[in-house]
């Protein structure tokens, strides 16, 4: 099942934290979705998507646990794959990435962490979105 893995490592205070991995079948699904971004294809591949959701939830949960070793993460949000098409000129129904946000405990802490996984470009972000 895990033919190839993406491994995220965070180095904090000379301690290396190993994170859960994203299986290659998740990346392959996102590649296929980009080529076939329509409801018929998605419905035919709904079982694959359900399996990937479990993998992503496990990954996000382990990332949250690891972040809590050095921070105070209050909650985790995994964003929906369905796009909001109401005001968009681009009518493709699905996102071709998986995004997740890790919110720090409030009101003591502000800011947070964000991970986005896609077949082309994945990234990790930390800090504040639109701070006042």
Give the positions of each predicted feature.
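Contiguous, amphipathic alpha-helical segments that mediate oligomerization or scaffolding
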Residues: 31-67
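Aromatic- and glycine-enriched beta-alpha-beta binding-site module
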Residues: 86-132
């Amino acid at each position: 099942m895990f033919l190839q893995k993406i491994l995220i490592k965070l180095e904090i205070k000379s301690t290396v934290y190993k994170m859960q991995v994203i299986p290659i079948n998740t990346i392959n699904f996102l590649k296929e979705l980009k080529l076939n971004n329509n409801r018929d294809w998605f419905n035919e591949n709904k079982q694959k998507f359900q399996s990937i959701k479990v993998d992503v939830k496990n990954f996000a949960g382990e990332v949250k646990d690891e972040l809590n070793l050095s921070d105070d993460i209050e909650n985790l949000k995994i964003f929906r794959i369905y796009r909001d098409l109401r005001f968009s000129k681009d009518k493709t129904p699905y996102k071709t990435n998986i995004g997740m946000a890790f919110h720090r405990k409030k009101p003591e802490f502000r800011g947070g962490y964000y991970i986005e996984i896609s077949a082309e470009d994945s990234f990790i972000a930390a800090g504040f979105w639109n701070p006042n």
